[in-house]
């Protein structure tokens, strides 16, 4: 599933100024996250013109255009306006050539402007569009922000995922999505999760029903999206099954083509799963900062064995 981005949504989310744009042009669809800077095209070379991309004008493009004759400038600007060109965006709050506005009006293409630098604007455009246009898949589970770490709680139906998430919310953590989490790959190492719009801020608790977390706990108890950094899989305790007691098993699970660390927590009466997840999140963060309690224990054990063997 891929979302659609309209020009007016880009304007609202990136606080862009609309220099020209009517209802039809602001409803044009952006189909790719790639951004084009039409430098060669201003010289008249259109062989490889990416007409279906947003066209970004920085100080180099504007300065070059200003040195052209008005008739030549208008001709080039008209050639830049294709049927599927989403919009023109000018950075640094630069003055926009009248010929660009004229050509845009003739072809129903919006002209937008931003006060920020070209490189920064390019980064913001790419980041926003890559996130919105990324292919999304859905996974079953509950995504919670635990101490700033995106923890995806998974497990069999009825194991207590939502109840555990509710306990975490009561302890000051934040809900991103319950039951169904829409995930997408942001880059090679990053997967992001968010709720479907219809389930935003909602959590289902058996015996109570649907709860609006933001209404009950406030805006600080929810957030719109989060990187999935750790997967916690809840499973029913089995008496004869051997569980990892040292934390030396580095299991991974693939989500949206990204490998994410996973830990499995056996659930049984008397275990406070919410607190265990809190500790798991803190321990995971400690590992990413270079401290591994398991390795420390193994080193101590090795030293003790060596000392005893030398006596």
Curated annotation (Swiss-Prot):
InterPro entries: HPr(Ser)_kin/Pase, Hpr_kin/Pase_C, Hpr_kin/Pase_Hpr_N, P-loop_NTPase, Ser_kin/Pase_Hpr-like_N_sf. ATP binds at residues 155-162. It catalyses: [HPr protein]-L-serine + ATP = [HPr protein]-O-phospho-L-serine + ADP + H(+); [HPr protein]-O-phospho-L-serine + phosphate + H(+) = [HPr protein]-L-serine + diphosphate. Mg(2+) binds at residues 162, 204. Keywords: ATP-binding, Carbohydrate metabolism, Kinase, Magnesium, Metal-binding, Multifunctional enzyme, Nucleotide-binding, Serine/threonine-protein kinase, Transferase. Residues 203-212 are annotated as: Important for the catalytic mechanism of both phosphorylation and dephosphorylation. GO terms for molecular function: ATP binding; magnesium ion binding; phosphorelay sensor kinase activity; protein serine/threonine kinase activity; protein serine/threonine/tyrosine kinase activity. CDD domains: HprK_C. The keyword Mitochondrion does not apply. Both phosphorylation and phosphorolysis are carried out by the same active site and suggest a common mechanism for both reactions. Homohexamer. This is HPr kinase/phosphorylase. The lineage of its organism: Bacteria, Bacillati, Bacillota, Bacilli, Lactobacillales. The gene is hprK.
């Amino acid at each position: 599933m891929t979302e659609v981005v309209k020009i007016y949504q880009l304007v609202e989310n990136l606080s862009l100024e609309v220099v020209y744009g009517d209802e039809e042009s602001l409803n044009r669809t952006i189909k790719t996250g790639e951004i084009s800077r039409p430098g060669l095209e201003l010289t008249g070379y259109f062989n490889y013109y990416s007409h279906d991309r947003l066209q970004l004008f920085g100080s180099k493009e504007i300065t070059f255009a200003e040195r052209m004759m008005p008739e030549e400038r208008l001709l080039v600007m008209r050639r830049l306006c294709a049927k599927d060109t989403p919009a023109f965006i000018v950075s640094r709050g630069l003055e926009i050539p009248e010929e660009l506005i004229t050509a845009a009006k003739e072809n129903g293409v919006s002209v937008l402007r931003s006060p920020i630098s070209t490189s920064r604007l390019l980064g913001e455009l790419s980041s926003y569009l890559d996130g919105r246009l990324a292919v999304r898949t859905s996974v079953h589970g509950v995504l919670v922000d635990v101490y700033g770490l995106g923890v995806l709680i998974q497990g069999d139906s009825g194991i207590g995922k939502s109840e555990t998430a509710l306990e975490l919310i009561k302890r000051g953590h934040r809900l991103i999505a319950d039951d169904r989490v829409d995930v997408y790959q942001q880059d090679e190492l990053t997967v992001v999760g968010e709720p479907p719009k219809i389930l935003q801020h909602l959590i289902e608790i058996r015996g109570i029903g649907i709860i609006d977390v933001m209404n009950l706990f406030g805006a600080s108890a929810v957030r719109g999206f989060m990187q999935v950094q750790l997967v916690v899989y809840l499973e029913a305790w089995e008496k004869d099954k051997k569980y990892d007691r040292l934390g030396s098993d580095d299991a991974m699970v693939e989500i949206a083509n990204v490998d994410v660390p996973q830990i499995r927590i056996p659930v049984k009466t008397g275990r406070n799963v919410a607190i265990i997840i809190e500790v798991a999140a803190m321990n995971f963060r400690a590992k990413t900062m270079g401290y591994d309690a398991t390795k420390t224990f193994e080193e101590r054990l090795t030293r003790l064995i060596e000392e005893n063997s030398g006596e």
